[in-house]
């Protein structure tokens, strides 16, 4: 019963913040080119969804070494959803690089588009690397990691 309640809360929170993200994107886009507002809403989504289960604890060591005024290029060895939870605890606005298949997931895919994340087609490594390089430079120039 508890897991059913958890999933209902997750769905409700995700839907509310999903709608809020798109409203924020439309309203804030002219003056929020880094998409900080949409990023903040996504942080709330992960904090809420992954903060509900009492057995999930988070600890980020070394966070004091990150300068929020700088842009970083980060590489994650994505082994689990814990990577996503952890990176949203960093004091940075960042963009994901994700395979195009992830964008087909309801709600999640639309949020990634709202973020301005980088979509790659893994069928062509050369094109994917070129896209990451071009779009990555654009976002780094705007101050996003």
Regions found by a protein language model. Give the residues of each.
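A transmembrane-helix-recognition feature enriched in membrane-embedded lipid enzymes
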Residues: 1-59, 110-111
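Soluble catalytic domains of membrane acyltransferases
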Residues: 57-145
């Amino acid at each position: 019963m508890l897991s059913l309640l958890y999933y209902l809360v997750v769905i409700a929170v995700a839907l509310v913040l999903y709608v809020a993200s798109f409203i924020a994107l439309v309203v804030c886009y002219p003056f929020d080119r880094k998409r900080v507002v949409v990023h903040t809403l996504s942080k709330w989504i992960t904090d809420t969804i992954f903060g509900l289960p009492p057995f999930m604890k988070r600890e980020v060591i070394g966070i004091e070494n990150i300068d929020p005024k700088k842009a970083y290029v980060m590489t994650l060895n994505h082994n689990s959803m814990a990577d996503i939870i952890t990176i949203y605890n960093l004091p940075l606005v960042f963009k994901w690089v994700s395979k195009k298949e992830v964008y087909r997931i309801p709600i999640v895919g639309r949020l990634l588009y709202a973020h301005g994340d980088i979509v790659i087609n893994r069928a062509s490594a050369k094109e994917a690397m070129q896209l990451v390089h071009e779009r990555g430079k654009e976002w780094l120039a705007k101050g996003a990691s």
